[in-house]
């Protein structure tokens, strides 16, 4: 493992690489929209919102009637549905506005059973028709009449077919795992107690991320907008769709895990593995992906609306295929790296630069980078790395190899790309802040040169992956031994 200091220059610095070449200056058509919106995000975050709600289903094909469950201390409210993406200077299109409804306060939270499951056992407030809507990622804004009385509900309008498309998958199982509405998440309970955490969290409750939008705005929306701007054929799905419709993904050209995508059921993981083995390209544009193992159960609102994860041996289900310890742990013993390429390395509160390892790789075309070029601030929070003591698909190319200090130990972040006999190419960016770097809206300051490079690499991958199996045109060249001549000790 290389832990030495890189001598490469920072992206765009005078002492090193030139600023990356920009994409061709061709006019890019924005998606048609009668009512593009630049004020969709005029929402004041609140720990006690005047309006909040959730949908009866997290993902549905256009034409589905969607139940809305709303609680409001505001005297009245309305729903405004925004399709999110690329609309020129706007990232939202207003597609529907409800009539004003009388506000009604519903029960705050009901915590159920030994699993500490926090539910919102609310009556349905209204039904929203979606006939004629386009597939895509939506935010439903609950408007209580002022900027301080607004929150969101995320919704995916699933594509009726994924054939020939690059499918953007929203990480709603991870959104839900971290959602602490009602005082419980899969991480903690009251007073931030890990011991009293929930072991089963339902989709039948609002998201508590201050605005109700989970992580969609900072970590998924920049990627969605860029993918739409590029103009490739896109499909849209949620994580739970990988569980419900596994065969629907087999005719896609690529499946993209957008953002932090940590929580996977056996069926979800098998859906991606089978698609890869049928020549479907995969990419993980986040870090810490496919790390936690979950299973689903039903709620009163439907199938697969309860997400179960114990994280330890207290799981009462002992069947190896269902027990919810980590994927790499007993009894699963199936590290995420066998699918993703790298695996979860560490969580850090310090921001580090990504360091270019192989600038000759096709993904760096047009970036102007050199070996050792640094992308400041992109490595942080959670990130991935290679451990050759675990299953690592080969041939595998290390694209970035970035020295990091985490939990007081030197280690490394790695971004990887491998190809398979089926022709599929699989990319693992392995960095939590990659997508927010596209829009320069990360916790760390992202400079323009770094954002340009991140955007160009993302564009290169999406454009090539949309054309079919990457391994036939861009086979991976193995360079793992350059950076890992011997197995690494520890996680």
Question: Residues of each region from the PLM?
Answer:
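Loop/turn elements at helix/coil->beta-strand transitions in domains of secreted/extracellular proteins
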Residues: 135-136, 161-167, 229-235, 250-254, ...
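Aromatic-Pro/Gly-enriched surface loop or interdomain linker
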Residues: 72-86, 92-99, 147-248, 469-472, ...
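Helical hinge/lid and interdomain linker segments adjacent to catalytic or ligand-binding clefts
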Residues: 107-119, 125-129, 133, 212-298, ...
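An acidic, glycine-rich "communication" segment
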Residues: 290-408
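Proline/serine/threonine-rich low-complexity linkers at boundaries of modular beta-sandwich domains
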Residues: 23-50
């Amino acid at each position: 493992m290389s832990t030495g200091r890189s001598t490469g220059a920072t992206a765009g610095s005078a002492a090193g690489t030139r600023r990356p070449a920009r994409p061709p200056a061709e006019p890019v058509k924005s998606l048609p929209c009668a009512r593009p919106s630049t004020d969709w995000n005029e929402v004041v975050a609140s720990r006690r919102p005047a309006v909040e709600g959730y949908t009866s289903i997290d993902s549905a094909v256009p034409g589905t009637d969607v139940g809305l469950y709303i609680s409001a201390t505001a005297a009245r409210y309305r729903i405004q549905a925004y399709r999110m993406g690329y609309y020129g200077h706007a990232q939202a299109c207003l597609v529907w506005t409800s009539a004003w409804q009388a506000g009604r306060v519903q029960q705050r939270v009901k915590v159920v059973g030994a699993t500490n499951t926090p539910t919102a056992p609310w009556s349905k407030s209204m039904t929203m028709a979606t006939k004629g809507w386009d597939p895509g990622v939506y935010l439903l804004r609950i408007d209580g009449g002022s900027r301080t009385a607004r929150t969101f509900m995320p919704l995916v309008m699933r594509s009726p077919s994924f054939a020939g498309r690059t499918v953007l998958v929203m990480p709603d199982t991870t959104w839900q795992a971290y959602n602490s509405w009602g005082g419980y998440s899969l991480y903690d309970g009251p007073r931030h107690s890990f011991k009293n955490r929930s072991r089963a969290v339902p989709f039948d409750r609002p998201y508590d991320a201050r605005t109700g939008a989970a992580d969609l705005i900072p970590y998924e929306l920049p990627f969605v907008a860029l993918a739409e701007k590029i103009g490739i054929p896109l499909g849209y799905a949620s994580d739970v769709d990988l569980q419900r419709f596994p065969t629907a993904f087999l005719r896609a050209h690529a499946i993209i895990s957008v953002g932090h995508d940590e929580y996977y059921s056996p069926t979800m993981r098998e859906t991606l593995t089978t698609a890869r083995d049928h020549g479907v390209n995969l990419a993980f544009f986040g870090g810490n992906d496919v790390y936690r193992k979950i299973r689903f159960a039903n709620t009163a609102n439907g199938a697969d609306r309860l997400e179960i994860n114990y994280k330890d041996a207290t799981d009462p289900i002992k069947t190896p295929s269902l027990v919810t310890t980590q994927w790499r742990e007993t009894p699963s013993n199936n590290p995420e790296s066998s699918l993703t390429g790298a695996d979860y390395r560490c969580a850090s509160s310090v921001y580090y630069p990504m360091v270019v390892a192989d600038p000759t790789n096709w993904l760096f075309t047009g970036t102007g980078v050199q070996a050792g070029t640094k992308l400041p601030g992109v490595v942080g929070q959670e990130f991935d790395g290679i451990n050759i003591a675990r299953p690592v698909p080969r041939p595998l190319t290390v694209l970035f190899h970035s020295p990091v200090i985490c939990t007081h130990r030197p280690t490394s972040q790695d971004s990887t790309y491998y190809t398979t006999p089926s022709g599929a190419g699989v990319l693992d960016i392995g960095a939590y802040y990659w997508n927010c770097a596209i829009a320069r809206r990360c916790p760390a300051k992202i400079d323009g040169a770094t954002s340009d490079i991140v955007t160009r690499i993302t564009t290169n991958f999406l454009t090539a992956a949309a054309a079919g199996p990457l391994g036939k045109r861009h086979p991976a060249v193995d360079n793992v031994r350059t950076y890992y001549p011997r197995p690494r000790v520890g996680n």
